[in-house]
Amino acid sequence: MRESTWVSLLLLLLLPTPQRGGPQDGRRSPEPEPERGPLQPFDLLYASGVAAYYSGDYERAVRDLEAALSSHRRLRDIRTRCARHCAARRPLAPPGAGPGAELPFFRAVLERARCSRSCQSQRLGGPASRHRVSEDVRSDFQRRVPYNYLQRAYIKLNQLEKAMEAAHTFFMANPEHMEMQQDLEDYKATARVEAPLLDREAKPHLESYNAGVKHYEADDFESAIKYFEQALREYFNEDMECRALCEGPQRFEEYEYLGYKGGLYEAIADHYMQVLVCQHECVRELATRPGRLSPIENFLPLHYDYLQFAYYRVGEYVKALECAKAYLMFHPDNEDVLDNVDFYESLLDDSTDPASIEAREDLTAFVKRHKLEAELIKLAAEGLGFSYAEPNYWISYGGRQDENRVPSGVNMDGAEVHGLSMGKKSPPKIGRDLREGGPLLYENITFVYNSEQLNGTQRVLLDNVLSQEQCRELHSVANGIMLVGDGYRGKTSPHTPNEKFEGATVLKALKFGYEGRVPLKSARLFYDISEKARKIVESYFMLNSTLYFSYTHMVCRTALSGQQDRRNDLSHPIHADNCLLDPEANECWKEPPAYTFRDYSALLYMNDDFDGGEFIFTEMDAKTVTASIKPKCGRMISFSSGGENPHGVKAVTRGQRCAVALWFTLDPLYRELERIQADEVIAILDQEQRGKHGLNINPKDEL
């Protein structure tokens, strides 16, 4: 593609998108909020709060965790306000013609960037870069993990009411968390509370929508209208916030591996396309309830579907017609609503021209922008060479199912059915022949169970992969090199606060061995046994292509004393390794943030001197256990990584459970970088070893 074409495409992509219509359009851009002092980074406050919790300083834990949550909310608000302020104050100029035609446009871009930096720095009390956090921290706040720590800290401080609020807030985003459910029941019984608990992170537009549905079903149409209209105002406000937050820094993971450095226009277009796709998918974000993977079907259109009939029932036929026409912007061929339009038009005064009644203004600009974005993404995908499948955001199978579906006197033929959730794709079936039963390659390894005996697909259980001596040696290495966390990002207790989670990578083990901090022989054993496991998996499942490491670490889970009473949570919740498990839909969606490139998984256990910690397979409902495996020294479980093998780990209630966890891929593009570096370290060590055993020749003898 010629450079001039790239310029045209880039300028087209960066043109300002249509703004939402409606009563708020005439408002001035939101002025930045007044000074309130430097904002402390929420990730540092969060880390401090968690550390205080584990040290038993519960007052400090509460203080820092509450401050972290407050900082997180304020940061989002500042970013949103600054984005809207600068978009209004520094509009992007359309490109002109002739030499340097793009310069005014890029000047406007630079001015907006300066405005954004100045606004955020002023409001934050320092550079915005201080508030960039890791994906792990961002994920914790999205999953409301801080509230799990908070409720426990409040209980320690005998503040039951606040503990209940925190527990309820966490549970709303983690409905599968059995221990929290039990805690909530116990709290309610103790406090004798019957009133609904407060969800501190409730989404206003979802709350208003739910209230509207309740009033609608109770035939209270005046109240239903009030809440649905409020829900729409809140929805569009949330949409603007979501879009503003998409404008932050982006990551180019696939390019990082290749050392890719694009030219000016390619780099800008690559970055902007990530922003645009993020903004385009805000409709899915806003339709998804906390803790769910599947969005509410047909969510935004349903507001207008409910409203068109509610307005009809209160005699406001013009508004009913506006809402019906708004619904048709999503589903222009919906026969029921087309009939409704004809019916509403027949009810208008003779002085009112039906053709003059148009679809709701608040939606017209929204849909126009959404369609324009879809066209731009498709155009850019063809030119930039990335894949993007436009989801059906407005799936129409999930319409209302009630006796008020169509007004009286209107044809009611044509049944509706519930169907697929919007924007979802079922994972493809495994694109290779499924075989098993190949040779185990090494002596002394004992075959225990195959897939059929484990009630599943592509599963195998083996014993004696490690000797007792090797288990003891690896356990010793683990205690010498492990960090609190997973070994890559140091994430403390990522799955449950009732256990300490520690991990280490192969590369770190070799580094410690090379520095003499652990025996080099023991560090080398970690490397060697992981390679042994890879060869066994590749051979047993009779794979026709090379199996590569995609992720390797040694991991120990330790039960925390004083926190094991009444435990019924899992050490590691039920999940799949290469797709997002959706128990409600009985599906596993092979899409980011899942590690979609993983093909096989293996766990090699080091010990059995602990209570609990059984590895379990389940059905896709994440509840029906199909197999349970008790870890012990030298035992290895391996399986394919997809939705056919949901699995988890039961709570470790006493002692420490250690294992080597391995994930493999058939795609060399996704080879584990640390493993490649570890291979290089091993090559250097082998070369040094060969040098030590070489002939000791006096250089003078060679003369």
UniProtKB/Swiss-Prot annotation:
Keyword annotations for this protein, in alphabetical order, are: Dioxygenase, Endoplasmic reticulum, Glycoprotein, Golgi apparatus, Iron, Metal-binding, Oxidoreductase, Repeat, Sarcoplasmic reticulum, Signal, TPR repeat, Vitamin C
> What is the predominant subcellular site recorded for this chain?
endoplasmic reticulum
Show where the Fe2OG dioxygenase domain sits: 552-666
- Which InterPro entries does the annotation name? Leprecan_dom (IPR056585), Oxoglu/Fe-dep_dioxygenase_dom (IPR005123), P3H (IPR039575), Pro_4_hyd_alph (IPR006620), Pro_4_hyd_alph_FE2OG_OXY (IPR044862), TPR-like_helical_dom_sf (IPR011990)
- Reported EC number(s) for this entry are 1.14.11.7
One GO molecular-function annotation for this sequence? iron ion binding
The UniProt regions of compositional bias labelled Basic and acidic residues, in chain numbering, are 25-36
Question: What does UniProt list as catalytic?
Answer: R657
- Which parts of this chain are annotated as the region Disordered? 17-40
Catalyses which reaction(s) = L-prolyl-[collagen] + 2-oxoglutarate + O2 = trans-3-hydroxy-L-prolyl-[collagen] + succinate + CO2
What Pfam families does the record tag this protein with? 2OG-FeII_Oxy_3, TPR_leprecan
Q: Which cofactor does it need?
A: Fe cation; L-ascorbate
Gene inactivation effect = Contradictory results have been described and may be due to differences in the methods used for gene disruption. No visible phenotype, but decreased 3-hydroxyproline formation in collagen COL4A1 and COL1A1. Full embryonic lethality; the vast majority die before 8.5 dpc. The embryos appear normal, but are surrounded by maternal platelet aggregates and blood clots that form at about 6.5 dpc, resulting in embryonic death. Maternal platelet aggregation is triggered by interaction between maternal Gp6 and embryonic type IV collagen that lacks 3-hydroxyproline.
Tissue pattern of expression reads: Detected in kidney. Detected on kidney tubular cells, pancreas acinar cells, Schwann cells of the peripheral nerve in the pinna, and in tunica adventitia, the smooth muscle layer of the aortic wall (at protein level). Detected in lung, skeletal muscle and kidney. Detected in kidney glomeruli and in prehypertrophic regions of long bone from neonates. In the eye, detected in the epithelial layer of the cornea and at lower levels in the sclera at the posterior end of the eye.
Q: Indicate the secretion signal residues.
A: 1-21
Binding of Fe cation, residues: H575, D577, H647
Its family remark reads: Belongs to the leprecan family.
Tell me, what does this protein do in biology? Prolyl 3-hydroxylase that catalyzes the post-translational formation of 3-hydroxyproline on collagens. Contributes to proline 3-hydroxylation of collagen COL4A1 and COL1A1 in tendons, the eye sclera and in the eye lens capsule. Has high activity with the type IV collagen COL4A1, and lower activity with COL1A1. Catalyzes hydroxylation of the first Pro in Gly-Pro-Hyp sequences where Hyp is 4-hydroxyproline. Has no activity on substrates that have proline instead of 4-hydroxyproline in the third position.
Record protein name field = Prolyl 3-hydroxylase 2
